[in-house]
């Protein structure tokens, strides 16, 4: 896994994973699988933050580059929950794979602080599982894909056209490749 100067950076992660033991597919929820552990996501997110800060990618607001503590929440939820959130906040019906609610604005409201609150990230485990089957890869890879997409949105990355989307998807692949 990519390592730089982890000692100077911190991640403040509020992590929640629903109990999926009652789902019909036993391969969907396997206790002990790292994707259900807070420590796994802390390490992944810290790695990605290190990469982003070291490369000073211009797709992100300048003020994130002097922060040392990054705070966010990540919840792994079911289709019913993500459908409810999708309807309430996005005015869209039905489940989706990932939702992110960034707290970053174009202005730095944390100028004199060394931390930043990024926002909230929700991933539907059921959608991730369906997509992992559709794309013929592991649930872990799909969860990393969805988390990277939502995480980039939390950092202010948008995709308003095909070119921006392609750039974002390529950067997601790059971030995930650095975890190996």
Curated annotation (Swiss-Prot):
Stretch forming the signal peptide: none
Name this protein carries in UniProt: Endoribonuclease YbeY
Enzyme Commission code: 3.1.-.-
GO biological process, one term: rRNA processing
Cofactor binding remark: Binds 1 zinc ion.
HAMAP family assigned to the protein according to its UniProt record, in alphabetical order: Endoribonucl_YbeY
Organism: Prochlorococcus marinus (strain MIT 9515)
One Pfam short name: YbeY
Molecular function (Gene Ontology), one example: zinc ion binding
């Amino acid at each position: 896994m990519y390592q730089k100067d982890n000692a100077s950076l911190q991640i403040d992660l509020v992590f929640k994973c629903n109990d999926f033991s009652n789902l019909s597919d036993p391969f969907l929820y396997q206790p002990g699988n790292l994707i259900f552990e807070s420590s796994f996501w802390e390490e992944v997110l810290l790695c990605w933050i290190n990469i982003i800060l070291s490369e000073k990618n211009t797709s992100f607001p300048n003020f994130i580059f002097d922060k040392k503590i990054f705070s966010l929440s990540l919840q792994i939820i079911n289709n019913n929950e993500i459908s409810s959130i999708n309807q309430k906040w996005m005015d869209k019906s039905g489940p989706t794979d990932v939702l992110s609610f960034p707290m970053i604005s174009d202005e730095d409201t944390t100028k004199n602080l060394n931390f930043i609150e990024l926002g909230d990230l929700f991933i539907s485990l059921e959608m991730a599982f369906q997509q992992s089957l559709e794309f013929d890869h592991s649930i872990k890879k799909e969860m990393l894909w969805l988390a990277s997409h939502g995480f980039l949105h939390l950092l202010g990355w948008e995709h308003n056209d095909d070119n921006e989307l392609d750039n974002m998807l390529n950067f997601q692949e790059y971030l995930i490749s650095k975890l190996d």
